């Protein structure tokens, strides 16, 4: 099926299809270290390549935007190369993208988020878009909540920290963008700190990753990652997000913004 990716189009092509488009999809990522395992493009390229595959499934039902390549990554600033954006700036960027496209006649918008640090800004942006402008915007993740059972027996649930440059994330990169994954992958060098205590898994504390979380910037064991797992993971999440879009674009869909993490 023909995909509609803004980066690959000229304006007359957008003009010709815009009345058919039911949902604009906006990938969000980061420029953030992922240890010795995957490049700074990890979050962005995962989200963007995922959305392109979604476009191949859904054709002229969706328009895939260029990715937002920066995010909130303050907790990774101990590692050279990481770039972080202030939350209030991110909110404005997300809103301005939607407001621009809404002016061209597009009605509904879904951010597909590849970086956990963006969650708060995305939630604030979609709420403000609806409350102030009456625009229906949503966001969803593309990570472990969808595929947790798939990695049973591969991810050690008893390890103190995991979930960054790990078995799951690295597998997805190996499938979606193999150029962004290194062959000589390393296990995370977890630090003995307050951050590695279980009580903070669903909470928070001040973090300097180099001293409090991981000496090499990875959490989990990327040595177990495979492209095959990444493909299986991606196809499952594609099913979930495609179904989400179909639900959100039904004629009788209720008004109001909704966030799915």
Residue ranges of model-derived segments:
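Extended, histidine- and acidic-residue-enriched regions that form the cofactor-binding/catalytic faces
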Residues: 1-110, 116-261
């Amino acid at each position: 099926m023909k995909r509609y990716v803004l980066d690959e189009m000229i304006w007359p092509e957008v003009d010709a299809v815009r009345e058919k488009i039911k949902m604009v999809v906006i990938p969000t990522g980061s420029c953030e270290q992922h240890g010795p395992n995957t490049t700074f493009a990890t979050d962005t390229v995962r989200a963007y390549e995922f959305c392109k595959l979604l476009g191949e499934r859904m054709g002229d039902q969706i328009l895939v935007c260029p990715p937002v390549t920066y995010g909130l990554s303050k907790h990774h600033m101990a590692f050279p190369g990481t770039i972080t954006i202030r939350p209030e700036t991110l909110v404005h960027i997300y809103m301005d993208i939607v407001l621009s496209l809404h002016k061209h006649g597009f009605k509904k918008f879904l951010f597909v988020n590849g970086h956990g640090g963006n969650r708060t800004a995305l939630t604030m942006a979609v709420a403000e878009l609806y409350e102030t402008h009456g625009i229906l915007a949503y966001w969803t993740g593309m990570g472990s909540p969808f595929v947790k059972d798939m990695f049973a027996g591969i991810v050690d649930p008893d390890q103190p920290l995991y979930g960054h440059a790990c078995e799951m994330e690295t597998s997805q990169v190996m499938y979606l963008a193999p150029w962004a994954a290194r062959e000589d992958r390393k296990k995370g060098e977890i630090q003995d700190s307050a951050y590695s205590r279980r009580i903070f898994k669903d909470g928070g504390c001040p973090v300097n990753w180099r001293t409090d979380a991981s000496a090499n910037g990875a959490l989990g064991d990327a040595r177990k990652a495979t492209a095959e797992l990444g493909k299986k993971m991606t196809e499952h999440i594609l099913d979930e997000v495609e179904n989400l879009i179909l639900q959100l674009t039904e004629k009788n869909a209720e008004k109001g913004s909704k966030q799915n993490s």
